[in-house]
Amino acid sequence: MEQGKVETIVCIRHGEKPLLGLGQLTCKGLNRALALPQVLLAKFGKPSFIFAPDPNQVTMDPGGEYCYVRPLATIGPAAIEYGLPVNTHFGFKDITGLQQELTKPVYESSTIFVAWEHIYLDDFVRALVKSFDGDVSQIPGWQGNDYDSIFVVRITHGKGKTTATFSRDAEGLNNLGSDCPRPGAP
């Protein structure tokens, strides 16, 4: 049997956020973002594409309304290190648009990193796996205090049949410090 093309979609949540939200990361979240490039590279190799929601989208956080930059700030260091652009064409609630985009033939043999908001990311992963008759019962809900999980969807494009499988991994970055990095500070 001929092996199909495999598309690997690696989904991460943004880094830690302040109590009031502010659309932003905490220093611990920034430290996570700075550590992510090497973690993701070691686990999945260099991606072909990176996605994050449109940072112009406004979100209501406990501290008020803010532009939602957390996912982009989280994946930005990886994009810089890998020399890749970040596709921000979709708002954080537009998981249908994201799913339609990532199921286009251009992505069939690619590794794609997606940084997003965890509730919508959970919905996206479930919808994507279900669309290829995959088993969604094995997909856990993404917990509110979980910044470390990696949800991975592998779409295998075979002869006449496309399937999707889910697996869960972890960044292993929960023990990072909560002080902001200060390069060059005495």
Question: Each PLM stretch: what is its role?
Answer:
Residues T111-A115:
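Periplasmic-binding protein-like
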